[in-house]
């Protein structure tokens, strides 16, 4: 909701909940959906069709969540359908990961995006100074947002 003049943008998503949230804005953006195979666990479209659709576009920014953050490896997930996340990162000029600080250190088996694919991490103020420095040392800009009660 804090995206400013989002109505001036084109937004592509594979998530119905994101699409519905964008539709509720007073001035909604041009909205594109990936299509693909519905995954009830992630409540999003996945698979080869979605990947093919994404490959035909070029995006300025990718905003993506993460199930886990591994200081050594990057973002991690339980979801084995991580091909779409990787394609999204490939077709975007800037990859911005949004994840709460408590996701750091979760031991999750699947590497989603290595730090070398990520330009910015937006997290909360609970991220320790040590973790902040270690992630920035990997070439990632880290933004700590203030937590609201």
In which residue ranges do the predicted regions lie?
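Short, small-residue-biased leader/transition segments that mark boundaries at the very start
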Residues: 2-7
């Amino acid at each position: 909701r804090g995206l400013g003049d989002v109505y001036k943008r084109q937004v592509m998503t594979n998530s119905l909940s994101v699409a519905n949230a964008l539709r509720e804005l007073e001035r909604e953006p041009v909205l594109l959906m990936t299509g693909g195979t519905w995954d009830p666990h992630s409540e999003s479209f996945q698979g080869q069709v979605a990947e093919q659709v994404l490959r035909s576009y070029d995006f300025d920014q990718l905003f993506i969540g993460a199930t886990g953050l591994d200081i050594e490896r990057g973002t991690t997930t339980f979801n084995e359908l991580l091909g779409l996340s990787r394609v999204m990162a490939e077709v975007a000029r800037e990859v911005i990961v949004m994840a709460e600080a408590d996701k750091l250190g979760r031991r999750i088996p699947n590497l989603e995006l290595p730090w070398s694919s990520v330009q910015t991490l937006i997290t909360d103020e609970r991220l320790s100074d040590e973790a902040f420095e270690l992630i920035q040392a990997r070439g990632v800009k880290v933004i700590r947002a203030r937590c609201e009660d």
